[in-house]
Amino acid sequence: MASAKPALLFLIFALISLTILTIFWNASSIQREAVPLVATTVVRGPSLLVFPISNSTGDPAQGIFADSLTEDLIGALIRFRNMRVFGADNTIHTLAASTSRDNERATTAEYVLKGTAGQFDGQLRVTVTLMDGKSRRYIWSNTFQRDFTPATLADVRQKISAEVARKIAQPFGVVYEEEARASADQKTNMLSSYECMLRTYQYWRQLTANLHAQARTCLERAVQVDPLYAEAWAALALVTADEGRLGFNRSSGRPDPIAKSMQLAQYAVALSPDAPLPLRALGMSYWLQGEPHLGIATYERAFSLNPNDSDLLAELGRCYSLIGAWDKGVPLILEAYARNPALSGWYHSILALYHYVHGRFGAALDEAKQINVPESVLPHVSLAMIHAEAGHPAEAAAEVEKIQSIDPQFADNAQASLERLNLAPDTLSRIADGLRKAGLFGRAQREASEQW
């Protein structure tokens, strides 16, 4: 029996390998192109060295709190997969100040994080500073003060750590802005795989067909240069999905972008099963294939891996809201915008829909005007139905003209297009009411829409 175990293990390994290769065969059907030699140097993100948080009180008993804060901070930072986080030796804080400065100067990390912490009169006070690891330039600093009791000390400490991590490491955070600025003038075909991810986040922030094309081209090259970069495969899956979801840059070579997106997402998850972005891509693929509960379960799994991810929080809010769980979904979107105001305006479409189905047309219009995705038909659908219900016929008619300009067949395909959003039945019915009032439908279409 003992001799059978190696054979069994080999068989299991072979089956797993075959599965990954099969997915890769499907995913790797991306058209190949010449890759500049400069792109063969793969950079997966900058490095961040976290120095131990110093005890600012002079009370040795508070050193334990500072050490625990350092550990919490590193733990929160490593949940983001867009930088390499290193912790300096915890004995450094026992060295003389001059020795500490020598250690800082000696680092090769792109960024250095340092700070102080202490407890004063029932308050925690934490000051954190981010510096350029090479030039020693100060990039960002903030002080966090929170009330606490002995019972809430650990919870408050962890919340401060999470807030610092989001400020620094999340998309559109401090490090993202620094890195994006550094590569802003580079041509797409000269970007590293990590820099392609920066461009993709720029697209997710400003959803336009031009940025979509740039992101797709860059990511297709990135996965050739760096085929084990799970996040790049996941980003490519999400960008490919937008060909069908938003109608951006449809390709005759991809007649079914949603199915292609699923293949890419599955491959990304096979490469890195515990990475949030691949799971987010898989969740989106399930959602677009009409399996909303599988999509939500996958998003929940991704969010459990990084509860500090504002994008995942907003995606969960979007999904719960569209299936009719407004009480659960809307607070998640509001929390996501509170955490990261630079999130895409796309999620305002969900808030607009929330107010619309509850008859608050003024509030719905305020939200819809913030969507800012003019090249997609869906924001104009929102504005058309809201204006119609609010008693603005001229504005509703203008939005109908924009819908017809972007997609002349939308009125014919409206039911199928909207059902792909996995809308709750009463929500779909309210949308149909608004679009009829807006004048989108001809007679036959109007009669059909009454059965939605």
Regions found by a protein language model. Give the residues of each.
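Catalytic-center loop of serine/cysteine hydrolases
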Residues: 20-37, 70-214, 218
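Short coil/turn linking the two alpha-helices of tandem helical-hairpin repeats
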Residues: 201-209, 237-252, 289-290, 324, ...
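A structural "domain/chain start" motif
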Residues: 29-67, 74, 189-190
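Amphipathic alpha-helices of TPR/Sel1-like and other helical repeat/solenoid scaffolds
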Residues: 211-228, 256-272, 298-300
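Alpha-helical protein-protein interaction modules
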Residues: 261-266, 275, 280, 294, ...
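Hydrophobic/aromatic side-chain positions at a characteristic register within alpha-helices
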Residues: 204-207, 224, 287, 321, ...
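Alpha-helical tetratricopeptide repeat
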Residues: 189-205, 234, 276, 280, ...
